[in-house]
Each structure stands twice: as structure tokens, then as C-alpha cells.
């Protein structure tokens, strides 16, 4: 869910397409960025319906190790193909996940 929030500002078009195709979000009433954020809300609601945690706080994970986690994630270079993520971006996503 946090990743979709982060990507909503970076490259919303694919998320917007997913929101329209999977959740029926109307492309005439919402722009791409709005639909990307709606996708995040819809995914969160779906996961909650399945009784799955949607935040790190629900898993009792705080931000004290975010720097180490981000550094470990990119120790072999940036991750991701849609939008390459460096340590700063990963830390931002982890922060959104709180």
C-alpha cells in the first residue's frame, strides 16, 4: 500500500489503469494521480477485509532501523524496474508504511 502511495506521484498511469480495471474507478471523474491514490485506499480496504496488516505499526515495527533496512535493500544497486529506487526512496516508502 505504501509503495502505491509513493508511486502515485512518480508514475501514476499504470496504477490508475489498475484502479480502473480492477476496482472500477471511473477515468472520467478522476485524473491519473487521483485514481492512483484511490487504488491505494481500495487495496488497503481489501487487505483489511482479509484481516491483513496494512502498516508497519500494525506489525509493531518502528522507524529506528529504516536507514539500515534501506541500505541493505540497495547494497547491490538500486531496486525496481518501473521506477528504480535508491536508499532514500526506500526509506520514504518505509516511512509511508508506518
Task: Enumerate the predicted regions with their spans.
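Gly/Pro-rich interdomain helix-loop hinge
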Residues: 2-65
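Short, amphipathic C-terminal "tail helix"
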Residues: 62-98
